[in-house]
Amino acid sequence: MSDINEIEIPSRKDEIRQVTPKDPMHEIEDKSTYHAKIKKSDSGTVLGAIPLNSRSSSNSSVTSTGQSSRRVTKKTTKKKKKNACYFDTCSSAASKFIGDCNFCKGHFCSKHRLMENHACNGLTSCKEQLHQRNADKLEAEQTKAPKIQI
């Protein structure tokens, strides 16, 4: 072979191989999962499924190494400040000592610290507990001796 552009063509079909490597991400654009072989140290090969979302390509980064391909999706969630009031429209700071709600586990400012003011989910169960406690207290205070008739 003296010319660089000449390529030797094998005579049998079994010897024909594809020379150019395929991009695994390009092949699976329309599939919902991609099975990647991940080799662990001396323990064998593990087959794992990695879900892909072809629509979220603008918010994700793709890294591929050797035998495994991974797709990492960044989640953009809105985090509240640690000491801000948990009420939706309030932006004031939560009270440190009196702002904790035991029923919904929220931290509220002095305006929204009461269960009625922040529309607590545990308001009905709290009312039932207080009603039962008052009934038990009244029953314990009642006199048990029969009344004397004159």
Swiss-Prot record:
ZnF locations on chain (AN1-type): 79-128
Bias (Low complexity): 53-70
Residues annotated as binding Zn(2+) 1: C85, C90, C109, H112
Keyword Metal-binding annotated: yes
Entry annotated with the keyword Membrane: no
Residues modified as N-acetylserine: S2
InterPro entries: AN1-like_Znf (IPR035896), Znf_AN1 (IPR000058)
Entries under PROSITE patterns matching the protein: ZF_AN1
Protein name (database record): AN1-type zinc finger protein TMC1
Phylogenetic classification of the source organism: Eukaryota, Fungi, Dikarya, Ascomycota, Saccharomycotina
